[in-house]
Every structure is written in structure tokens, then in C-alpha cells.
């Protein structure tokens, strides 16, 4: 029986640079295949992508890669962890969507379009599977630090994370087409 152990690690800028563009490209391809029009994909330290679906729904997407997740989701992982610092995106989402006209202009939307949705996407390292987590589910999830008895003083263990239950009815895991170029 194969036993997988959870591996915590510090933020790694090189890993971010290697993964961020690829993750956005895969998510863009997936969303376009689902009739979303990309309205903004510039790096501006906000959410990663803004889209409008054919239905008229405006959506915003934040994507990251969980490198510890290979081809198979480890059944012992009962939660997806997202850094609590992503709360700033939820706060920005609420703040900006309260003023519809300016929000539409700032996000290259032709007019006030509702409903809005901010979704957090966590992809595996192969970029072919992902968890899709709506902002309201993330916001209601418990916030805790990671427990790791082997490295109790490691700096990354002091960072709080949202702990999202993988069995929550409003999150889902999808297979994605891998984009290699």
C-alpha cells in the first residue's frame, strides 16, 4: 500500500514563476471551452482572470498549483488549504462589486453584469485536475495554521490557511485538458 505524506514548504518565488503562467493558460483554455470570454488576464496582483460567460455572468478566477498533488488526490487529504492572505481578494471583490458602473469599467466589462462570482481554483502539478471553490465557501471555511509536529518552528507553519472540506457540496473537482503550449 502506497502511503503519501503531506509536505509543507515555504513560498518559493521560482516555483511561482514556473507554475503561474502555465496554470492561467490551462484555466483560460478550460473557461473558453465553457463559453467564457476572457476580459482581463493581466498580472495586477488581483485575481488572475476575469471572464463573462455567454449567459452574461461575470466571473473572477484565482488559480494556484498544489505541487504535492500528483495524478491522484490522496484520500487522506480531507481538505484543500488556501492561504488566508487570499482574503484580500474576497474583500476586493465585495468592495469593487458594490459600485457596479466603475467596477464594470475597471474590469473591461461592457456594462453592469450580475451575478458576479469569484472562484478559487487549485490545480494539481500536472495541471489536469482542479478543485473549484466559490468565494463564499472559502470565506466560511475554518482558518487555522498547519499542524506539523516535525517542524514546529518552521515559518510557513505560522501562516493561517482556510481549510476547505473536500466533501462540501458547493466545491467540485474536475479533470481538465492539459495545455502544453
Regions found by a protein language model. Give the residues of each.
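Acidic-basic catalytic patches of nuclease active cores, encompassing PD-(D/E)XK
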Residues: 1-43
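Short connector loops at helix/strand junctions that flank enzyme active sites
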Residues: 44-46, 58-62, 113-117
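Mg2+/Mn2+-dependent nuclease catalytic core
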Residues: 69-109
Amino acid at each position: 500500500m502506497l502511503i503519501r505524506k503531506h509536505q509543507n514548504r515555504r513560498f518559493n518565488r521560482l516555483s511561482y514563476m514556473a507554475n503561474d503562467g502555465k496554470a492561467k493558460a490551462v484555466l483560460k483554455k478550460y473557461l473558453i471551452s465553457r463559453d467564457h470570454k476572457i476580459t482581463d488576464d493581466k498580472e495586477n496582483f488581483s485575481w488572475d482572470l476575469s471572464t463573462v460567460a455567454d449567459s452574461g455572468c461575470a466571473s473572477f478566477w484565482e488559480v494556484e498549483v498544489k505541487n504535492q498533488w500528483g495524478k491522484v488526490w490522496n484520500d487522506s487529504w480531507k481538505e484543500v488549504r488556501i492561504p488566508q492572505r487570499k482574503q484580500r481578494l474576497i474583500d476586493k471583490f465585495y468592495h469593487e462589486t458594490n459600485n457596479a458602473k466603475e467596477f464594470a469599467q475597471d474590469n473591461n466589462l461592457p456594462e453592469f453584469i450580475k451575478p458576479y462570482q469569484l472562484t478559487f481554483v487549485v490545480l494539481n502539478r500536472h495541471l489536469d485536475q482542479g478543485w473549484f471553490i466559490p468565494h463564499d465557501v472559502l470565506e466560511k471555511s475554518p482558518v487555522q495554521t498547519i499542524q506539523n509536529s516535525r517542524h514546529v518552528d518552521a515559518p510557513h507553519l505560522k501562516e493561517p490557511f482556510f481549510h476547505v472540506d473536500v466533501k462540501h457540496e458547493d466545491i467540485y473537482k474536475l479533470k481538465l485538458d492539459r495545455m502544453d503550449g
